[in-house]
A protein has these predicted regions:
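N-terminal domain-onset segments
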Residues: 1-63, 73
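Short, compact, well-ordered microdomains
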Residues: 61-95
């Protein structure tokens, strides 16, 4: 899959995470590293290359989802990988 990475500003989602999941300090810290993204669609942005997900040697090793709520953007799903890295973000109101 050929991807085009774009600059991304995660400040807005960091603020929401600090308010809604303050106990998840590692996830909040890792959101700060989400400064480039690949927009698969209006509803989903990747922060980690996702080819061959969950296969050996793939960077994408899924662990869990965390759902956050934004007044402006609605429900947001964070894809959290095994090392608490942020794999991607999904905007449910854009599906």
């Amino acid at each position: 899959m050929k991807v085009k990475w774009e600059t991304y500003n995660p400040d807005w989602i960091i603020q929401i995470a600090k308010e809604q999941i303050p106990e998840e300090t590692e996830i909040i810290q890792n959101l700060k590293h989400c400064i480039k993204c690949f927009k698969r669609s209006k509803a989903y942005y990747y922060f980690v290359y996702s080819e061959n997900p969950n296969e050996p040697n793939s960077e994408w090793q899924f662990d869990e989802n965390i759902i956050l709520h934004s007044k402006e953007k609605g429900e947001i799903v964070l894809d959290i990988l095994l090392d608490k890295k942020i794999g991607g973000i999904e905007f449910l109101n854009k599906l």
